[in-house]
Amino acid sequence: MTALTHPSIPTTTSAVPHGLRLVGAGTRLWRVVDRAGRVVGHIQTSEEADALRFHALRYSARIRRFLEVGRFWSLDDAVSCLHYVR
């Protein structure tokens, strides 16, 4: 197993913009949680063309799966997307 290390990837619970925080949910997956503890969405990482991409995901109860709402070059942009999509 390879560990993904990158300066912009949080390794523990981290504070991010808009009063949200990240909680680890897997090797390349974080829950984005608001101040009240509600899950706003998820951030998933992938490596594409020697660069790291951040995928903003929202769960749709109607179709019972995650939908990608955007791909970003920065973690802050992905979190901002989830903040404004709610």
Which residue ranges define each predicted feature?
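A short, charged, amphipathic alpha-helix used as a generic interaction element across diverse proteins
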Residues: Y59-R65, G70-R86
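Negatively charged, low-complexity tracts enriched in Asp/Glu with abundant Ser/Thr
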Residues: M1-R35, R62-V69
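Functionally constrained cores in energy, signaling, and assembly domains
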Residues: R31, H42-T45, R86
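A broad, structure-centric signal for solvent-exposed, well-ordered loop/edge residues
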Residues: S8, L29, V39, D50, ...
